Structure formats: C-alpha cells, structure tokens
Amino acid sequence: MALIIQKFGGTSVANIERIKKLVPIIKAEITKNNQVIVVVSAMAGVTNQLVTLCSEVSSLNKISQFAEYDVALSSGEIVTAALLALALQEEEIQAQSLLAWQLPILTNNNHSKALVEFITTDLLEKCLQLKIIPIIAGFQGINKSNRITTFGRGGSDTTAALIAAAMKADRCDIYTDVDGIFTADPRIIPNAKRIKEIDFLEMLELASSGAKVLHPRAVELVMRYKIDMRVLSTFLPNTEGTLITSKDTTPLVKSTYMDMEESAKNIKRSTKINIPDDTSGLTYKLPIELALQNRYNMENCIIRGITSNKNLLKVSVNTITLSFLQVANMITYNNNCIEFMQEIKNNIEYNFITNLTDKNNLQTLLTNCKNNKQIQNFTFDTEIATISLIGYGIKNDCKLLEMILSQLTQDNINVNMMQLSEVKITLLINDKDVEKTISNLYNLFKIS
C-alpha cells in the first residue's frame, strides 16, 4: 500500500463538470489499494477575482490589511475543497474537506508569502485510518496568532509538496492541463517532446527559468525531502506524464522534519492529548503553542556549505560599435567562459567575469578590437573572488539576504555583483576579503 498525494490545479477544478471528473481519477488510485490525500487549488480565475475585489476596497499597504487579504484569497481553495468532497460523497466515497487551521499547517507571520514551519499530521493519519479521503484546501496556513496566511502564487503546489514531506508520502502527483514536462512550450514548438523522467535539479532549473507547470518552491521541497513527483494531465488521465525523481532516496535534510516530528509526538504524549475514535474527532488539532515549543520550520533556509573562487578575471569593456551580445559572443568565441554578464551603461560599458586563465587570450582579442575601433577601451581586474553559499530555501527566505548583507556591511565588505537561485547565492567581492567573509558567514549560519 502506497500513500499518494494528489494535487489538482485551477484548470482541473474550473467548473462543476471538471470537479466531477476528478472522482474517477481519485477512485482509480484507491482501487490500487493506495491511500490518497488530495490538495486543491481555487477554481480557475477565482483567485484573480478575489485579488481584484480586495484592491477595489483597500490600498493594501498595511500588515493588517494583508492579513485580511489572505483571509479573502484563501476562500477560493476552501470552496473547491468542499465541492470536491461533496462530489466524492455523492459517489459513496468517504471524503472530508480540511482547512489549514484544522491540521494545523503552521507558518511564520509573512502574510501573502508565508513559509511553513510545521504540519501536525494526526488528523490526516486519523482520516486515513477511517478510510476517509482528506481534501485539503491548498495555498494557506495559520500563524501562531491564529490568523490565516497564504503562500503566494503556486501555493497549492507548495501545500502538496509539504503534505507529502510531512506524511512521508511515496509520491506526489500534480494534475494540470498538460500531460507532463516538455522540452519546450508545445504552444510555441508543436513538435516538442514530453520528458518521461527528469532529475530534481534539472526540474528546479526549468521551474526557476519560467516553466509554469510547477512552482520552483514545490520542486525545491520534494528535492529536499526526496519525494518522487509526477506531472499528469487531468484531461488525459491514462498518460504517463513526467516523473521527477532521484536515484538517491536519502533525504537531503536528515535532522529537520524527521526530528521535529518525533518531538511533536513526545509533546503530545507528555500532555496526554487523546484523539477520539469516531469521525467527530476529526476536529482535533495539536495546540499551536505546544507545536512551537521548539522552533520548527519545514521550509527553513538550510546552508549546507560555503565555497570561494579566486581564479577569476573581471573584464570591463567600453564599446564604440559593438552591442552587448556582440561583445559577449566575441569573448566566448575562443572557448572563454563567462560566469557573470552585466550592462553598466546602455550600449556603452559592459562587465564580464571569466576565468583568470583566459587573461592572455582576451588581452590579444580585445587589443585587436581596440585597434579596429570596435571598442574604445578595456580594463582587467584580477583582485576579485566569488563566495557561494549552497543550500535549500535560499530564494524563498527573505531574512537570509538581510542577514548576509547586514554581516557584510558590519564587516565593511563591498559586494560588486550578486546572484540568487533556489539553492545558491553567489557574491562577487574583493579577493582580499575572502577569508574574513567565509569565516564570518560560516559562524553566522553555524554551518556544520
């Protein structure tokens, strides 16, 4: 018996007819003797309507206003969860809609872009024991002040990934309007091929680069907790879709959710909280103050390591006739590798970071360009280095960047360039500051 999380997006629940068509998809998984937990989005277009309504009555420039904004936006998923539960019940399948406060899904206080700290799974486990299918309203959580929070766009994908991690699910299936991940957008490239299987990191790059099938936050979470994810079509339920997986099944964060889950069970045992055996007990939740006795965070930013590279060359070019792309093409022509590209002044000055070993080659190349009056001047700077912090949840955690910049300001470190992704932040600094920066950031984040 496997535990499958099924998430249905906005187009999959766009109207009553489509909601009814989800019943056989869910039932098919049950007939395989699998347990199922469902996460739903709002019906297509509903969230946009709610955003418009909020903007018509509020400027949304106060924290208190964003708290109410979250309440309004969360209603879309709540309606969908109830409608799908009704559709399943109509077919004699036991189902119950569940909201964030009922589990609870505990978050920080960042309204409209909350990060999840802890999910209490007792209620979900009880539903599964009683063969009741939980239908969870996605996109939302609850903070320690008992206020509704939302996760931002793509939040239902995030809910599904988090529930999969909390429940140690065997797989998380994302149902949408396309039958998998393609080599390019099929609307632009009609002969684009569906990818049968893709690695977590490759999928994270695609999602971060604009592929809208999955939200990068959800991909980062299943990669972090090593949970297989499938992208499937609601409208072509018999297709294979795309499997997002890794051959290594060891969770990348061994001591976060696994440890906090056991701690929560100890809290529950020590406070003698009982879960009733009948279905009326499905309003049970672990008190928030107990769950937060230890500071848990399922989406906490984890820094796994810090690296540096001094083997770099900064090239500054003042052009006369060459465009940005022409200069970049010229530099890469003889196998010179560009790591950073930056336009300083429109069509006038550009900066490139490349390998220090390319200096002599570039000296000859750019001198010829200057003699041919293609560029006005160029300079080299060898006193540069990069510092990279590698981990998880980096782009989602606003406090991370704040902590780094505060530390660098305190240390009088000048940052020339910066790049962020879901799994890495890279800073370009003076090479004389490398050791000091590494030491202080290492201690700041207690990397071990």
Swiss-Prot record:
Keywords: Amino-acid biosynthesis, ATP-binding, Diaminopimelate biosynthesis, Kinase, Lysine biosynthesis, Nucleotide-binding, Transferase. GO terms for biological process: diaminopimelate biosynthetic process; homoserine biosynthetic process; lysine biosynthetic process via diaminopimelate; threonine biosynthetic process. Gene3D superfamilies: Acetylglutamate kinase-like (3.40.1160.10), VC0802-like (3.30.2130.10). It is an enzyme of class 2 (transferase). Disulfide bonds: none annotated. Pathway: Amino-acid biosynthesis; L-lysine biosynthesis via DAP pathway; (S)-tetrahydrodipicolinate from L-aspartate: step 1/4; Amino-acid biosynthesis; L-methionine biosynthesis via de novo pathway; L-homoserine from L-aspartate: step 1/3; Amino-acid biosynthesis; L-threonine biosynthesis; L-threonine from L-aspartate: step 1/5. This is Aspartokinase. It comes from Rickettsia typhi (strain ATCC VR-144 / Wilmington). The gene is lysC.
